[in-house]
Design a protein with these regions (language model features):
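Carbohydrate-active enzymes and regulators
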Residues: 1-179
Length: 179
């Protein structure tokens, strides 16, 4: 349904993408003005007629859907890129730890359970907050992908040693996030 898609895409752009880009910009990364302008242009093109009310022909309906898909694809890719750019700017004092970064794109503090998927290089691990305190977590499900992942490893520079874990798990984890 185009109404649902319209709401989902606009909420993603205003509540996730734009705050993420603003955080990234404040850390010294470029703000992608042209891409954001293109996103809003595509959204306004869809709002220019009765497409959301389903009062159009099938071909126009397909065009509207494709514009929403374009917006979603651009927005998701920008969030992915800028979340990585932000995460690389966060200092990790210990060199032997893997960093997990959660983002709050809303203007108020939050306390809620966050469920995410990640890859784990060990069976036992700890999650710590920014202050070094242990964070309680629950592993909802875990799949051993060691053979698959390690057989897919590509070395861009064979002269450099790369980190290869002894095991690799794909896991769904729930944590209680505060702030």
């Amino acid at each position: 349904d185009l109404k649902v898609l319209n709401t989902q895409v606009q909420n993603y752009v205003t509540n996730i993408l734009e705050p993420m880009l603003t955080m990234s910009y404040h850390l010294g990364n470029d703000y992608p003005h042209e891409a954001v302008d293109e996103i809003w242009k595509l959204l306004f093109e869809n709002a220019a007629h009765d497409s959301i009310g389903s009062c159009i022909f099938d071909t126009a309906n397909e065009d509207v859907y494709m514009r929403y898909k374009q917006v979603r694809d651009i927005a998701v890719n920008l969030v992915e890129l800028h979340s990585r750019l932000i995460a690389t700017k966060i200092k990790n004092e210990t060199t032997n730890e893997i960093t997990l970064t959660l983002f709050n794109t809303l203007p108020q503090k939050r306390k809620e359970t966050i469920v995410f998927e990640t890859y784990l290089p060990a069976d036992n691990f700890a999650i710590k907050d920014a202050y070094g305190n242990l964070v309680k977590y629950t592993v909802i499900e875990k799949t051993d992908l060691t053979d698959y992942v390690l057989s897919q490893t590509i070395r861009l520079n064979p002269s450099k040693k790369i980190y290869l874990p002894s095991v690799v798990y794909h896991a769904k984890i729930a944590i209680e996030a505060n702030e």
